[in-house]
Amino acid sequence: MASGVQVADEVCRIFYDMKVRKCSTPEEIKKRKKAVIFCLSADKKCIVVEEGKEILVGDVGVTITDPFKHFVGMLPEKDCRYALYDASFETKESRKEELMFFLWAPEQAPLKSKMIYASSKDAIKKKFPGIKHEYQANGPEDLNRTSIAEKLGGSLIVAFEGSPV
């Protein structure tokens, strides 16, 4: 079911910047986004970047000790959101970084909000080609390291964001 909701150009630009890793200076790397949260505009017609809801790579280890915990804390308790998270994890063979797309639809969110976000999900996903990992979370219990590691590769994952799973 399509909702007719549009996706802002800035959302597409942020996705591209997160997906494409260029050879960058240390300063440019610090400005790269680790996580970004998207919401519907006030008129509910466009998916936009939620103001102030991002984590920069340069903040990790400086002002943010646990980026995933901080990311989960940025999600509203009683409304839906979309998010991109640049997950860093280790398998038994190697260290990887891959983008994850989240639909956050908590149980306490209004039914209308859940319906609009669910029906608009395809619109934003079409703007994010190549996303390997998509995850819908309905509460904080769905956003723990174990469930995310399971989604990323199950028993092959030994650490997520530097912490063992």
UniProtKB/Swiss-Prot annotation:
The gene is Dstn. GO terms for molecular function: actin filament binding. Keywords: Acetylation, Actin-binding, Phosphoprotein, Ubl conjugation. One of its GO terms (biological process) is actin filament depolymerization. PROSITE patterns: ADF_H. This is Destrin. It comes from the Eukaryota. InterPro entries: ADF-H, ADF-H/Gelsolin-like_dom_sf, ADF/Cofilin. It comes from Rattus norvegicus (Rat). It holds the Pfam family Cofilin_ADF. Actin-depolymerizing protein. Severs actin filaments (F-actin) and binds to actin monomers (G-actin). Acts in a pH-independent manner. GO terms for cellular component: actin cytoskeleton; cortical actin cytoskeleton; cytoplasm; glutamatergic synapse; postsynapse; presynapse.
